[in-house]
Amino acid sequence: MRSKQREMPAQRRHELFFETAKFKTEIAHIPYKWRKRLIARTLDKMAWSSWHKIYESIAVNFVRDFAKQYVPAGINMTQDDNDIIATAKKAAGQVSQGLCAAQSDQHALLIISALCRDYGIDTPAFEELADVVARAIDHRWWRRQLRKSIGRAFEAGNIRLGYVHYRGEPYASNEAVLGRLAQNRRNALAMAATVLENENGEQFSIADLAEKTTANKSIRRGELMLRINGFETIARETGDQGIFVTWTCPSHFHATRRNGYANPKYSHATPREANQYLCKMTALCRSALARLGIGIYGFRIAEPHHDSCPHWHMLLFVRPTEKYKKHHIHDVAGRAIRIMKRYAWRTERGEPGAFEHRLDVKRIDWSKGSAAGYIAKYVAKNIDGVEQHKTREGYTVATDLNGDVELTPSMRVETWAAKWGIRQFQQWGGAPVTIWRELRRIKKEMVNKAPEPMRRAWDAVQKIDGEKRADWAEYLRAQGGAIVPRKELVITLAKDEKTVIGRYGETIKVTPYGVHCSALIGVVFKSVRHTWMPVNNGGDGAVFDLPRTRVNNCTHQNPESPKTRLNSSTFDVNDQSENNKRTTNGDIRGTNFPISKNDQLKTQPRIKELTNEC
């Protein structure tokens, strides 16, 4: 009589399938760091079936779906920065060779789109084909796009698999922080090695000039606190009500729970998508408040939860405007809070804890101290780590070591913001800080006979060491108040438009050269600017990008898509005279810094002329 053969347990068969060539082929594109946790999650998916035709397809499809979302097509996620540079040169060469066979402009665009898709990046979005081709054949453009694409995909995978949380790697993964530190070191070496000379014969390195701007973290922190204190001064004078608001995302934006376990409701959204949700909700809220005649001004700060999901802290002051109709409701702040709750609870309103955690509001009691104290610690700890880092969940994030490299909490936050392109600090209401900085570049002789608002504003922005501090509140008064509309500003920027030749062809550059005062139509108070020329070439292929512009998240009646601005061949550096006693507190900008002629690319309408390889 034949004995019965004992059947192998299902879990053991699942584990043996991972050793087969079929599964190894699928997981070969996954970074080594992810494989163990990905296999564990694949086992959970396979657990309900013991038939090989089912559990094998489940495992393969799960890994394929994961790779499709977190591993860009045609990209090896394990490559380092040197490999990315080599890949960028290879991709640019492939585009140049492909364009040689292009039969028409449409055919050329299809070739570029196909190659961009193969490398998992977006095709350059420009109306003119020459602008698209100029970027697609430049290895530096490919390098920037690949760094961003690979970095964000790898970080999103770390969040999805539960590596980024308080008990593991808070705010950002260790690899992302180490990459950011390496990038900062490269930039610092390039800036220190590049020396500029102005028309007066004075020479400074770019690193020396950057130390005088808001790139210096202590200057940046000081300027932010100066502006916050100025808003508080205005609020106290006018009797405006103050509130401190913490706005968080719904639970499906969070990858990890407080205990470190995966959140089953997680929708695989990235921190950038979560921040876009907050931008949309607060924009709707601000528009609703404006329609009701409730004016708000203050600051908002974006911070990460322990699992990298953002939340916003906002110090806001509210007052009724001329459009406010319900004068019998004196508690304007209470009405504003109700509007905020309406939009904070709008998404997934019925989920447990929504009313408790989505929106936390504290009214500011002026008798208990300064309103700026509510937000000062968030400014300090997120710029240079002066304050202790505590997460929204109450955990304390301490400095840790990766090898011999110290990873501070503030460095993790900086990495998080840079990786996902999240703006950490934003002013709501008030006069623009750009005009404040431009006023500091104007000499006293220019305003001696100026109208009173101009003299008041100029005097408010000046700082003399040991004698006088700058006064943001007085600057707001001279401009018309804390909630003055942009079209009613007393002082505005004087801008100059000119066409420049950059790396990607001709573009229009808008540069401020002074300010206008509404009391003197047609008169420009010119600012002091220097012309800086490079004395030496500190880095091969170094690129200087224009700073990003202001962003307005509010809804508009006639939305217009902003025109894309290209990198210009010049950037501005401000006056830094040793004889001037006033410190600029970060306002060193000035003048035309041309890219070398070897880096200029004069675009032509035909494809053959754009590619040297043809």
Predicted segments, located by residue:
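Right-hand nucleic-acid polymerase module
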Residues: M1-S308, P320-C614
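Short hydrophobic/aromatic beta-strand micro-patches
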Residues: L315-R319
